[in-house]
Amino acid sequence: VAYEVTGAPDGFPVFLLHGTPGSRSGPKPRGIVLYRMGVRLIAYDRPGYGDSDRREDRHVADAARDVEAIADHLGVEQFAVVGRSGGGPHALACAADARLRGRVTRVAVLVSLAPWNAIELDWVGGMNTGNVRGFGVGSPDTAAVVEEIRQRAERAAADPRLLLADLRTEMSAADRRAVNDPALRRLITDTYAEALRSGPYGWIDDVLAFRRPWAFDLSAIDTAATPVRLWHGADDNFAPVSHGRWLAAQIPGAEMEVRPGAAHFDAVEELPRILRWLVDPDAALGADLLIGARPGQ
C-alpha cells in the first residue's frame, strides 16, 4: 500500500481516505496550512489505485486493516480518520473496527454514500444518471458493470480532463461553481491521473465493494468513545444528502451537518474546518486555512 505523509511531523495524525476514483495525491490543505494546524496528514492509495497493489474481492471493511498496517508501520498509536465521498464508507469501517477501538479518536465523513442495501432509502433518489449508470444500479450483471468502469477508466487515464468534463455535464450549479476554480480542477485531474495510471482496478474494486455488504455494522460504532461527524451539501447529486441522513440515523450519537446551497465538491472547501474538529474541537478556524495547491507549495 502506497502512502504519503504531509504537514507537521509532530502533529496529531489524521488519515485522509480518498474518493472514487482517487489517490493519495487528492485535494488537501497545503503543507504549511497543515503545519500551522498541528496536523500530520496521512493519505494512502486504496488497493488497485496508484502505487498500491490490487486486492481482489476486497470489502469496505478491509480499509481498517490498511489503516492499521500504516499506523503500525509509522509507530502511530492514536489517530483520527476523515473520508470524503467514496472514502466515507471506509472511514466508518475504521470507526466500527474492534481492533482499532481505543486507537481511532474521532471520525469525520464528508459526502458519503450509504450502503447499497440500505433499508428504507431510495438509493438513487436525487442521484445523477452518470453515477446511477456507473454503479450499475438495477443491473445484476457484474461483468457489464466492470466493463463500463473499465471503459470510463481507460478514457480518463488517456486524458483525465475528459472525466471531469463528463462529470460537469451533470453537476449542480454549486459544483460547477466549485470546479470553476482552476487550482481545484488541476488537483482533481491530477488525482484522477495518479489513481488510474496503473489500470482501472482500484475504481472497479471500489464499486464492487459498494455493491456488496460493507462487512461491518454501523450500529457497532460507539460515538461516546469515537465521536462521528457527517457533513453533506444539500444539493449533492453524486452522493445525495439522503445518504448522509440515513447514515446519521444508523449511528447512535453521530452529528450531522447539512450545508444549504452546497454540493459534492464543496467538501474540499470544508476539509480544513473538519480537520480542526478532528484534532482540536474547541479551536477556532483560522483565516489562513487555504485549499488549492499541492502540499508544500
Show where each model-derived region lies.
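Conserved alpha/beta-hydrolase "acid-adjacent" motif
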Residues: 237-243
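Conserved HGGG/HGGXW glycine-rich cap/lid loop of the alpha/beta-hydrolase fold
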Residues: 2-51
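Conserved hydrolase catalytic core segment
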Residues: 78-123
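Alpha/beta-hydrolase
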Residues: 129-217
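Glycine-rich His-Gly loop
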Residues: 16-20, 85, 112, 233
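Catalytic active-site module of serine/aspartate enzymes centered on a nucleophile-bearing elbow/loop
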Residues: 253-297
